[in-house]
Amino acid sequence: MDDLKYGVYPLKEASGCPGAERNLLVYSYFEKETLTFRDVAIEFSLEEWECLNPAQQNLYMNVMLENYKNLVFLGVAVSKQDPVTCLEQEKEPWNMKRHEMVDEPPAMCSYFTKDLWPEQDIKDSFQQVILRRYGKCEHENLQLRKGSASVDEYKVHKEGYNELNQCLTTTQSKIFPCDKYVKVFHKFLNANRHKTRHTGKKPFKCKKCGKSFCMLLHLSQHKRIHIRENSYQCEECGKAFKWFSTLTRHKRIHTGEKPFKCEECGKAFKQSSTLTTHKIIHTGEKPYRCEECGKAFNRSSHLTTHKIIHTGEKPYKCEECGKAFNQSSTLSTHKFIHAGEKPYKCEECDKAFNRFSYLTKHKIIHTGEKSYKCEECGKGFNWSSTLTKHKRIHTGEKPYKCEVCGKAFNESSNLTTHKMIHTGEKPYKCEECGKAFNRSPQLTAHKIIHTGEKPYKCEECGKAFSQSSILTTHKRIHTGEKPYKCEECGKAFNRSSNLTKHKIIHTGEKSYKCEECGKAFNQSSTLTKHRKIHTRQKPYNCEECDNTFNQSSNLIKQNNSYWRETLQMSRMWESL
């Protein structure tokens, strides 16, 4: 028993503060060895110390003061070194040297036993507190107790150590952690971390790239990016990544592996996050709602993109042509136009695209998959966005309104096209003949006039068309489908444009006005025909008689009259 001395040592556990180690005082018997103040001191870096607010710093000093009392109680003294603030030297906040262990246990200072808590508004470092209080100790205040082999042999003479004695027991076989201060410290620490998130303060800055963080832990994690920059390389294509997990996901591009499968429909994905997003299709959940207009989305990124509609902000500008965009991804895609780059290639037919979304849409041509079904009419679609647009046919919803004339549309693209009527803008020009259009699909359709290509063929009658939309409309002739119904009179149409024209009968609206004579029309095509009266333009020429007409319909009538006359003549000759 004489070979044993009662000691204090730190028990290290994870705490709320990044990088810090929570030290619990543990009292146990161990073989006689040199004990230092560092053994029970918690050491912080400058960044970690700045993480604490004044209340936490005070609490920390109180805990360390208690540790110091315990060491004095057990026979460890601390030297009186100059009170230099360690924080100013960017060293650990608490760094104290001790005297060598004395032959006999040192005295217990009565000054330390008077109170357990230092001043609440103390600004000094803990080292200065210790030195100031230790300096007040005089020899007459020291009460020595020699030859103590254990704690219970040492009789406490000051009331200030009553609480300390309660934490200690004379049982040599057990270890009792005293976490009286640690619990309070942990509570303060979590409260401070929570407050930092609300204030948006980011005190921890990366010296390499300048990025700031609100927590030291996040900065530590971020620093690993610089340490292991591009350290994980793909053996297949040589592309390098900062994270092993990113490399693992990348490899699936080469292997085609899709380990994350939807239990509802069996569709598989390369990433778990994509599967999570996909599942919302089945549940219909849209947890992300716009505070401005109330519109809801199933992805936070979609909400972020949507918000820019209200602000009108376009921070991403093309250096080549000056065009601005509200998304960085849209700018990246736009740049492919200038470069002529088409990095996304279809493995089935080798067709290339400048957008990944275009490739994805294209692939459905080969698979014929239509997983999105309309509950109203049972029609299937290969895209959820297409289904959303289709549903507006049944509901009559037109959320996109023109600010100039008040006309509403069920698709944003239709509103964009409509606005060009007011501006007169036609940005899409044919290189072959110079004709300009306000929509790129119109230019694409026009180009086929020059090539004569008709890739879309009707399986029913074999008729070919230059556009897939025209083929879709044509098929309704065979099926008799008329999905566009007038709510006013119940009349149905196989084209939405026909329904739009029909509705004007009920409203009497004539929004297309002739600038020359002021006459108004309910259709833009009628206005175009009318204008030829003023210009005396007659672009339609009859090959039979060289007569010219200002309307194609008049030319058709002329041709029909020739055809009827020819037919009558042939019949007359047959009767002779």
Swiss-Prot record:
Keywords: Differentiation, DNA-binding, Metal-binding, Nucleus, Repeat, Repressor, Transcription, Transcription regulation, Zinc, Zinc-finger. GO terms for biological process: cell differentiation; negative regulation of DNA-binding transcription factor activity; negative regulation of transcription by RNA polymerase II; positive regulation of transcription by RNA polymerase II; regulation of DNA-templated transcription. Its main location: nucleus. InterPro entries: GLI_C2H2-zinc-finger, KRAB, KRAB_dom_sf, Znf_C2H2_sf, Znf_C2H2_type. SMART domains: KRAB, ZnF_C2H2. Residues 35-106 form the KRAB domain. It holds the Pfam family KRAB. One of its GO terms (cellular component) is nucleus. It is found in: Nucleus. SUPFAM superfamilies: beta-beta-alpha zinc fingers (SSF57667), KRAB domain (Kruppel-associated box) (SSF109640). Transmembrane segments: none annotated. One of its GO terms (molecular function) is RNA polymerase II cis-regulatory region sequence-specific DNA binding. A zinc finger (C2H2-type) spans 176-198, 204-226, 232-254, 260-282, 288-310, 316-338, 344-366, 372-394, 400-422, 428-450, 456-478, 484-506, 512-534. It comes from the Eukaryota. Sequence-specific DNA binding transcriptional repressor. Represses target gene transcription by recruiting HDAC1 and HDAC2 histone deacetylases. Acts as a specific transcriptional repressor for PTCH1 during embryonic development. Required for osteoblast differentiation and sonic hedgehog/SHH signaling response. Binds to the consensus site 5'-GCGCCC-3' in the promoter of PTCH1. The KRAB domain is necessary for its repressive activity. Interacts (via KRAB domain) with HDAC2; the interaction is direct. Interacts (via KRAB domain) with HDAC1. Belongs to the krueppel C2H2-type zinc-finger protein family. This is Zinc finger protein 431. It comes from Homo sapiens.
